[in-house]
Each structure stands twice: as structure tokens, then as C-alpha cells.
């Protein structure tokens, strides 16, 4: 995919606190020795997520940019993605050999989706602590994302959530589209997300 469209662009969305930035951090650290990567984050009035990635050492600072969206964060990834498209263009100008751009949306609801003009692949992150009914609620993030990540599975016993119910509902709502159960704190399930990005996105190390 990256051969024909420039770098592969992966959009990562999900509600506030679901684990989007943690996933961005882990993906950068896991893939940075295999591919040329840049990271773009979206926040309403701050650049907190970008600053977190810099502090964490996810990538060098020049490969991380924070977009301040103002207003509704979903607008900046869907109806008017111009700020994010400009950020991608700037990164491509700085790093012509980019293989992968990770784009994190601002925290939003289940209706948030990425414009196909902005993202080649979309990953939607939800968390068990929000309740086991979340997959059954549907919405574009649940039903249409290329990969659904159900994070914080370790919290299920503490919040009375049934992981079996979440998996059954995810299968029912998504059909053949894949989902992954994760505990990003311990990196459980991370390898499956990485494998999905590489396989579905057509990435080849050293290409």
C-alpha cells in the first residue's frame, strides 16, 4: 500500500482514556527500527499527547507533531481533515523515505471515523472499564474500523465486565472484520496489532 500512496497512513481513534496514546507509543517503539515512522496527534486545545510521546522517547522530536483541532475533534479527521493532511505533507517533505504515519484522533465518541483521504487503515480502541455493552452499541468505530482493539482486559474482574460477551458482541457487530483483545500495559495482544498493520498495510521492513 505504501508503494502506491506514499507512506501508509494508519488512523487510531477511540474514546478518551481508552489507550490510543499508549498504543501510539508502543507502535512507534516496536516499529521504529524496521520502518521510517512519523506520528501525528490531535488534541482540542493542547498538544499533550504529542508531548507525552516526546517525553516517552517514542520517536525523535522532529518526527512527532501535535495538531490543535479546536471544537469537535472528529471534524479534523473526517469533514475537514486539512490540518492533518497538511501535517502529513510536512512530514513527507522532511522525511521523503517515510514508510508509516500514525495519526491519533482526539478523544471522541463511537461515531468518529477517519476520512479515507486521511487514513489508509483505521484502528479503533475501546476499553473494558467503560463496560461490556460497548461493542453492542455499534457506531462506525465499532463496526467499520479495519481493526477493533478491546483494551484493558485485565480490568474486567474489577468492573464486572464479561470478556466473553464483549467478544461475542464484537463478532456479531463486525462480521469478518478482525478485533484484538489487549492489555497494552503488559503489551498483551500488541504483536497481533503489529502483524495486522504490516500484513494489511503491505509494509516490508527495509523496503
UniProtKB/Swiss-Prot annotation:
<keyword id="KW-0342">GTP-binding</keyword>
<dbReference type="InterPro" id="IPR003495">
    <property type="entry name" value="CobW/HypB/UreG_nucleotide-bd"/>
</dbReference>
<dbReference type="InterPro" id="IPR027417">
    <property type="entry name" value="P-loop_NTPase"/>
</dbReference>
<dbReference type="GO" id="GO:0005737">
    <property type="term" value="C:cytoplasm"/>
</dbReference>
<dbReference type="Pfam" id="PF02492">
    <property type="entry name" value="cobW"/>
</dbReference>
<comment type="function">
    <text>Facilitates the functional incorporation of the urease nickel metallocenter. This process requires GTP hydrolysis, probably effectuated by UreG.</text>
</comment>
<keyword id="KW-0963">Cytoplasm</keyword>
<protein>
    <recommendedName>
        <fullName>Urease accessory protein UreG</fullName>
    </recommendedName>
</protein>
<dbReference type="GO" id="GO:0043419">
    <property type="term" value="P:urea catabolic process"/>
</dbReference>
<comment type="subunit">
    <text>Homodimer. UreD, UreF and UreG form a complex that acts as a GTP-hydrolysis-dependent molecular chaperone, activating the urease apoprotein by helping to assemble the nickel containing metallocenter of UreC. The UreE protein probably delivers the nickel.</text>
</comment>
<comment type="similarity">
    <text>Belongs to the SIMIBI class G3E GTPase family. UreG subfamily.</text>
</comment>
<keyword id="KW-0996">Nickel insertion</keyword>
<dbReference type="GO" id="GO:0005525">
    <property type="term" value="F:GTP binding"/>
</dbReference>
<keyword id="KW-0547">Nucleotide-binding</keyword>
<dbReference type="GO" id="GO:0003924">
    <property type="term" value="F:GTPase activity"/>
</dbReference>
<dbReference type="GO" id="GO:0016151">
    <property type="term" value="F:nickel cation binding"/>
</dbReference>
<feature type="binding site">
    <location>
        <begin position="14"/>
        <end position="21"/>
    </location>
    <ligand>
        <name>GTP</name>
    </ligand>
</feature>
<dbReference type="InterPro" id="IPR004400">
    <property type="entry name" value="UreG"/>
</dbReference>
<keyword id="KW-0143">Chaperone</keyword>
